């Protein structure tokens, strides 16, 4: 062996290296994705699902913080059958010493989604009720939305709201 490469050999090994690098990135993939926002009125896009935190309210009579969220199941969504199931399992609310999750201080309602599904291209509004949480008394409150809570729970959208942001944005409930 002379230690020299012909142009043809060089191109062949360069192509093989490129294929190997591309193949290894496909095998490892992306392990997680947590989109983060810090203000009300902002949107996150995860798995082609766009979620927007529209408003935060506080119901003092019931000691409940209410998050109004719109969810749009985007075109070409990466979800099975292109329909997105949304219920209490899709959300958590955390704060210092506080957790609301499915079956624990958390309730989700929607005036739009009668069957808890957001079909491809549709937008639905959801109200996430965190019972026992006075967000104005916490330094930081985080709302997390999981488009696929079971299979891909590492892919999520988050709104980390500080006390200062909440003081500016929080309102009293405007509906019954």
Report the location of each language-model feature.
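A mature extracytoplasmic/lumenal domain signature
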Residues: 57, 71, 83-85, 130-132, ...
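Surface-exposed edge beta-strand/loop patches
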Residues: 119-176
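A generic structural signal for beta-strand entry/edge sites
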Residues: 62-66, 140
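Short, well-ordered beta-strand segments enriched in hydrophobic/aromatic residues
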Residues: 65-73
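N-terminal secretory signal peptides and thylakoid transit peptides that target proteins
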Residues: 1-21, 25
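The feature marks short-to-medium sequence segments in extracytoplasmic or secretory-pathway proteins
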Residues: 59, 74-124
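Low-complexity, acidic Ser/Thr/Pro/Gly-rich terminal tails and inter-domain linkers that flank the onset
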Residues: 35-60
């Amino acid at each position: 062996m002379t230690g020299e490469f012909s142009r043809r050999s060089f191109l062949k090994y360069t192509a093989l290296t490129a294929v190997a690098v591309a193949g290894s990135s496909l095998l490892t993939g992306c392990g997680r994705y947590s989109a983060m926002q810090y203000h009300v009125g902002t949107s996150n896009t995860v798995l082609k699902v766009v979620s927007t935190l529209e408003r935060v309210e506080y119901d003092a009579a019931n000691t409940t913080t209410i998050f109004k969220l719109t969810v749009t199941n985007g075109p070409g969504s990466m979800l099975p059958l292109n329909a997105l199931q949304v219920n209490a399992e899709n959300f958590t609310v955390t704060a210092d010493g506080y957790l609301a999750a499915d079956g624990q201080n958390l309730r989700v309602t929607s005036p739009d989604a009668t069957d808890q599904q957001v079909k491809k291209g549709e937008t639905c509004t959801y109200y996430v009720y965190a019972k026992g949480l006075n967000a104005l008394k916490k330094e930081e409150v985080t709302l997390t939305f999981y488009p696929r809570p079971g299979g891909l729970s590492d892919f999520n959208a988050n709104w980390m709201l500080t006390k200062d942001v909440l003081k500016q944005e929080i309102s009293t409930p405007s509906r019954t």
